């Protein structure tokens, strides 16, 4: 059906009104602000058009929400894991592929679908180990060092906050590299192989300046250091050392040592060896009776241990702990009282 005349007249009037409002404006086709104003005027003059646009926008959002809900229900995604030594940004987010990731820039995985295609392919015709051997730590900066550490050791596997001392020593001494192995068990080391927070890698120039500053510092010998420390002492409270007082101190020291040994020997129980030696010293016939004894102890007559047994019984009746050793002292200690009580029981 042809449009009614009333509607045609109304549309023509609106069009004329729009032309009148924008008449005389400069730079209609150049200025973005003017174009924006013209669109605003046109939308105000035709409210149904703006209403249709908003309705389509709401319909589009509703369809997107339904599609996201359908994917979440029928296409579940398992937790995406990262292997040790792999940068998460080199992997495309699995939820982003399905359109369900709502983390945006905070997601640790990449939202670029071309990230996997841009990865450099490994050249099978070249051996890269020689390049790594020449790529020593002397040419690295702090950023390169952290990347190599992450590539070699991967994500930390331990819960301790302590950093491996061998790792720090290797980094500070410039011995760390691609082929460095931790002496504390290699990859099974229980401590962290990562730089502590606030660590700053010193450059070769800084190390050279430190060495020069150490070389410029005054050096003294051990004798000079001792004399310097002696000069700091308060001489009014000390006695100067002379030959006479040193000899007297040595004599007193020897006497005190002898008295301490006598006091200790009077308290402790004599060993079997000491009893034998004492008996041989007191009884001269003990040596003469055994002078004809053959060298081979497996051949010969039995010993008369009567005196030794009496000495043991005499020692057993004393108040202290009993004999603590036997023979030459190499045997384990034992308690005669405990042994006698065990035999009686």
Curated annotation (Swiss-Prot):
A GO cellular-component term linked to this record: cytoplasm
Composition bias type Basic and acidic residues, residue spans: 46-70, 316-327
Alphabetized InterPro entries for the sequence: ZC3H15/TMA46_C (IPR032378), Znf_CCCH (IPR000571), Znf_CCCH_sf (IPR036855)
Alphabetized GO MF terms: mRNA binding; zinc ion binding
PANTHER family, per the entry: ZINC FINGER CCCH DOMAIN-CONTAINING PROTEIN 15 (PTHR12681:SF0), ZINC FINGER-CONTAINING PROTEIN P48ZNF (PTHR12681)
Quaternary state and interactors: Interacts with RBG1 and with translating ribosomes.
Name of protein: Translation machinery-associated protein 46
Taxonomic source organism: Saccharomyces cerevisiae (strain ATCC 204508 / S288c)
Record gene name: TMA46
């Amino acid at each position: 059906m042809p449009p009614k005349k009333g509607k045609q007249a109304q549309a023509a009037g609106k069009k004329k009104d729009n032309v009148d409002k924008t008449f005389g404006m400069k730079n209609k086709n150049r200025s973005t602000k003017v174009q924006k104003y013209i669109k605003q005027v046109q939308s105000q003059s035709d409210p149904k058009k703006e209403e249709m646009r908003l309705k389509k926008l709401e319909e589009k959002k509703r369809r997107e929400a339904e599609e996201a809900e359908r994917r979440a229900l029928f296409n579940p995604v398992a937790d995406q894991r990262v292997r040790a030594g792999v940068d998460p940004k080199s992997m495309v987010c699995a939820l982003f592929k399905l359109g369900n990731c709502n983390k945006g820039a905070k997601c640790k995985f990449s939202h670029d679908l071309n990230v996997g295609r841009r990865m450099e392919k490994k050249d099978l015709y070249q051996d890269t180990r020689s390049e790594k051997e020449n790529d020593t730590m002397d040419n690295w900066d702090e950023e390169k060092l952290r990347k190599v550490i992450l590539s070699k050791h991967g994500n930390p596997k331990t819960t301790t906050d302590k950093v491996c001392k061998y790792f720090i020593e290797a980094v500070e001494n410039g011995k760390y590299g691609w082929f460095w192995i931790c002496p504390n068990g290699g990859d099974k080391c229980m401590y962290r192989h990562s730089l502590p927070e606030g660590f700053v890698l010193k450059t070769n120039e800084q190390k050279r300046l430190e060495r020069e500053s150490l070389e410029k510092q005054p050096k003294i010998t051990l004798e000079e250091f001792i004399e310097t420390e002696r000069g700091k002492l308060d001489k009014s409270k000390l006695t100067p050392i002379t030959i006479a007082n040193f000899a007297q101190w040595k004599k007193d020291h020897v006497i005190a040592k002898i008295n301490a040994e006598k006091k200790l020997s009077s308290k402790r129980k004599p060993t079997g060896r000491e009893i034998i030696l004492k008996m041989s010293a007191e009884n001269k016939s003990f040596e003469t009776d055994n002078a004809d004894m053959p060298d081979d102890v497996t051949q010969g007559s039995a010993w008369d241990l009567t005196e030794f047994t009496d000495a043991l019984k005499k020692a057993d009746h004393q108040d202290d702990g009993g004999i603590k050793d036997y023979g030459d002292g190499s045997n384990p200690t034992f308690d005669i009282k405990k042994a006698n009580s065990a035999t009686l029981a």
